[in-house]
Amino acid sequence: MSPAAGVPELPALDGKGLRLAIVASTWHETICDALLDGARKVAVGAGIDDPTVVRVLGAIEIPVVAQALARTHDAVVALGVVIRGETPHFDYVCDAVTQGLTRVSLDASTPVANGVLTTNTEHQALDRAGLPDSAEDKGAQAAAAALSTALTLRQLS
């Protein structure tokens, strides 16, 4: 996997003692499974061997499950994919998911990393999924962002 332009190296993280949850949708299974694999690898690399993983059907279901997980975890990673179609549904789903995850994070004071891909094509999603031929691994990036922010919040407490 060659890095995309402008993407920083993922930091080394010591997440031992952090409770991490990952909520991932199942639409576009190959992509979502790859995102989940990337997030799990970052968790294990940070010393979190068994993050809580919850699967939901689609992206629109992710925020409410993230909300429940934010009550009992130090960080939450949201993973899924929404691919533009021929109707405005794409815009509604993307807006609802983004606003929902942001609200959950702020209301719970818990980092909720948005690793929900919003792309025009399936090819664009595959290129960001962390597969062997992908340019990026947004699952890994989202997990690193969630854990890094949780560690920052812990230092600020």
From Swiss-Prot:
Query: Kind of enzyme, top EC level?
Result: transferase
Query: Which Gene Ontology MF annotations are present?
Result: 6,7-dimethyl-8-ribityllumazine synthase activity
May I have one GO cellular component term? cytosol
* Keyword annotations: Riboflavin biosynthesis, Transferase
Pathway assignment reads: Cofactor biosynthesis; riboflavin biosynthesis; riboflavin from 2-hydroxy-3-oxobutyl phosphate and 5-amino-6-(D-ribitylamino)uracil: step 1/2
* Keyword Transferase applies: yes
Which residues are recorded as binding (2S)-2-hydroxy-3-oxobutyl phosphate? E86, T87, R128
Offer one example of a GO biological process linked to this entry.
Answer: riboflavin biosynthetic process
Disulphide connectivity of cysteines: none
Query: What are the binding positions for 5-amino-6-(D-ribitylamino)uracil in this chain?
Result: W27, A59, I60, E61, V81, V82, I83, N114
For this protein, the record's Gene3D superfamilies field holds: Lumazine/riboflavin synthase
EC number(s) on record?
A: 2.5.1.78
Indicate the residues that form the catalytic site: H89
Q: Which reaction does it catalyse?
A: (2S)-2-hydroxy-3-oxobutyl phosphate + 5-amino-6-(D-ribitylamino)uracil = 6,7-dimethyl-8-(1-D-ribityl)lumazine + phosphate + 2 H2O + H(+)
Please give the superkingdom of this protein's source.
Bacteria
Query: What NCBIfam families does the annotation carry?
Result: lumazine-synth (TIGR00114)
Family of this protein? Belongs to the DMRL synthase family.
State what this protein does: Catalyzes the formation of 6,7-dimethyl-8-ribityllumazine by condensation of 5-amino-6-(D-ribitylamino)uracil with 3,4-dihydroxy-2-butanone 4-phosphate. This is the penultimate step in the biosynthesis of riboflavin.
Whom does it interact with, and what assembly results?
Homopentamer.
What is the protein name for this chain?
6,7-dimethyl-8-ribityllumazine synthase
